[in-house]
Amino acid sequence: MPLDPGCLNGRVMKCLTFFLLLPETLKKSRKSARAQGKVQACYEIVPLALKKKMAAELYPASANTNIANSNAAANAKKNALQLQQAAPPPPQLHNLNNNNIESGNWQSFHPTLRERNALMFNNELMADVHFIVGPAGASKKVPVHKYILAVGSSVFYAMFYGDLAEVKSEIHIPDVEPAAFLILLKYLYSDEIDLEADTVLATLYAAKKYIVPALAKACVNFLETSLEAKNACVLLSQSRLFEEPDLTLRCWEVIDAQAELALKSEGFCEIDLQTLEIIVTRETLNTKEDVVFEAVLNWAEAECKRQGLSITPVNKRNVLGKALYLVRIPTMTLEEFANGAAQSDILTLEETRSIFLWYTAANKPQLEFPLIKRKGLAPQRCHRFQSSAYRSNQWRYRGRCDSIQFAVDKRIFIAGLGLYGSSCGKAEYSVKIELKRQGAVLAQNLTKFVSDGSSNTFSVWFEHPVQVEQDTFYTVSAILDGNELSYFGQEGMTEVQCGKVTFQFQCSSDSTNGTGVQGGQIPELIFYA
């Protein structure tokens, strides 16, 4: 059986080590001999038996030591080296199976400190402690390296190297989700942030708990980017819990502008009672009060289910507590109250009677509900023309599309359009308005408006305000059907400053009726910011 080249190399190294140490050994031996009054011979230092043993290790009797075999060993070593040099580059961090180091010389394949640290992520190699992460029955055992965690988090530093440092080999963390904890560790080991929608809140909790502000900020930015009406109420609740004022402010922007969508979302029914009270108290909710009342009832039903209570009017009142009396029921129209709250059974007979009397009687009874209507949000208007004009032979509607593209430098909510009407007296128009982004329709509405013959603009609204992101071009269109002669805008501007928002305009290929940047229809964009 031929000798393994690896074994041969090992024995050569032993011999080489011996000869490197030989001069020092000779010096020590001579000094010892002088001290004893005699000089030792070299054969006493290197006995013949030892020489034979070393020779046997280098060239065992079972091995063929002819030149051909030596050349074969050299060739094998050369081939192994070539294979090593031709090895593929190390895989990306997220593909690493970190409990299977690829070779005994793995350090040479990872030239940077970050790569080498990243290879240790979730790796048993050199791990000096384990975390048991997650609740009992759903926990995960995670290997970690104290030093890496300690240099990335003051909490971990205190845990491992502080005055009250943990000495256990396993540390239990039942309040953190395993997936979120691994995202935290991946950042500490490699600076990589790999966030996902279904774990970002749990990751934010972990980042806050272990004081890793860069990861916490990344989580907040991720949440702000994904924020929309259907999750705004839940994120508001979480932002208050995590004390993230910027995220809280963004949540309020969405909830105020898209209040009806937010209150009708499933997420609204998942919030805590305190957040419910804060939302219902909000002065700037941009919706009708019967929508608020219906949302509160839906929340009460969901809360009864969470508490294991039967869904009855009494239990709904009990779980709501004072929140019921934050709804501004008297600000509904009489019709809205009669068709909604009065038939809900959650109000007592006395409360229902008193509210009806408040609507109709000269001597109004005192009510426990707020009487003042919410202010809502005041819409803002971006006017893109400096003047308007009318020429009988120039601007007509024939069911063609008027369209313009726009972009903004901060997030806003487009609520509708301001349009020119007839230049020949009072007239009614049917109109279809549309908002698109990169060809995808975000909102549209088919409605009517009446113009009075003046050059004023007339508002046409989308069903719900639409969130518009910054630095992206959107297309608004209007197709009018009615009196053919109309006012039109002149001296159009490519850039308009409107409050804190800057609008940019450019022509749209969808426009087939002559509207462009310099003139035409769609003089105003109506928005909330």
Swiss-Prot record:
Domain BTB per the UniProt entry, residue ranges: 127-197
Organism: Xenopus tropicalis (Western clawed frog)
Lineage, uppermost ranks: Eukaryota, Metazoa, Chordata, Craniata, Vertebrata
Role noted for this protein: Adapter protein for the cul3 E3 ubiquitin-protein ligase complex. Involved in late neuronal development and muscle formation.
Oligomeric and partner information: Homodimer and heterodimer. Interacts with cul3 via the BTB domain.
GO CC field: cytoplasm
Annotated protein name in UniProt: BTB/POZ domain-containing protein 6
Keywords from the named record: Cytoplasm
Disulfide links within the chain: none
SMART domains tied to this protein: BACK, BTB
Main location: cytoplasm
Coiled coil ranges: none
Compartments, as annotated in UniProt: Cytoplasm
